[in-house]
Regions:
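Active-site beta3 strand of CheY-like receiver
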Residues: 49-55
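Two-component/phosphorelay signaling modules centered on CheY-like receiver
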Residues: 15-34
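C-terminal output helix
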Residues: 95, 113-122, 126, 130, ...
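A short, hydrophobic beta-strand element within the central beta-sheet of small alpha/beta folds
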Residues: 9, 55, 79-92
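CheY-like receiver
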Residues: 127-168
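Alpha4 helix (beta4-alpha4-beta5 surface) of REC/receiver domains from two-component response regulators
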Residues: 22, 67, 81, 92-107, ...
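The feature encodes the CheY-like receiver
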Residues: 61-64, 89, 93
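Helix N-cap/capping motif at the beta->alpha junctions
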Residues: 35-44, 65
Length: 168
């Protein structure tokens, strides 16, 4: 994998965490690393430069990671609605993971982060990308991770409203 070709945006209000992630990414060979202190600053960076991957903290102010991803995915003037997002947090409760998933996060990484964890999530994004789904109340990567070979119908969930558009 050519990590040296990736453009990665780090969004975290903690400078030490951005430094740690930068060192891990540089050790992998990533050369184009951009930084933002919160979601609002990240949106500004994305208006100027297209990123391959966004790594964002969940808990930041004034615009936290969930709100940032919601804007990234759903705002009419979003600069990168299809950008893959890895959410990083020390608050990895099931509720927070579900919030991140429902906001449109591609991958979730719990703190403390390790180089192995970062590599694994980046590899998942690149080698196993998920198609994007748009339905009445969600836009983002397909939240279903398992494939059921016995499934033959168009819906996986009973009661799915409306038409689902697949976007690549």
């Amino acid at each position: 994998m050519r990590f040296d070709l990736l453009k990665i945006l780090l969004v975290d209000d903690n400078q030490h965490m951005r430094m740690l992630l930068t060192e891990i990414l540089r050790a992998l060979g990533v050369r184009q690393i951009y930084e933002a202190m919160d979601g609002a600053e990240a949106l500004q960076v994305l208006r100027e430069t297209q990123m391959d991957i966004i790594m964002t903290d969940l808990t930041m102010g004034p615009l936290d990671g969930i709100d940032f991803v919601n804007l990234l995915r759903n705002s009419p003037d979003s600069p990168s609605p299809f950008a893959p997002v890895i959410m990083i947090t020390g608050h990895s409760t099931m509720r927070r993971v579900a919030e991140a998933r429902d906001a449109g996060v591609n991958e979730f990484l719990a703190k403390p982060v390790t180089a192995r964890g970062v590599i694994h999530r980046i590899n998942l994004l690149i080698e196993h990308p998920r198609q994007y789904i748009r339905c009445q109340d969600y836009f983002g990567p397909d939240r279903r991770r398992r494939q059921d070979p016995a499934f033959t119908g168009p819906w996986r969930r009973q009661g799915d409203p409306g038409v689902v558009e697949l976007q690549y």
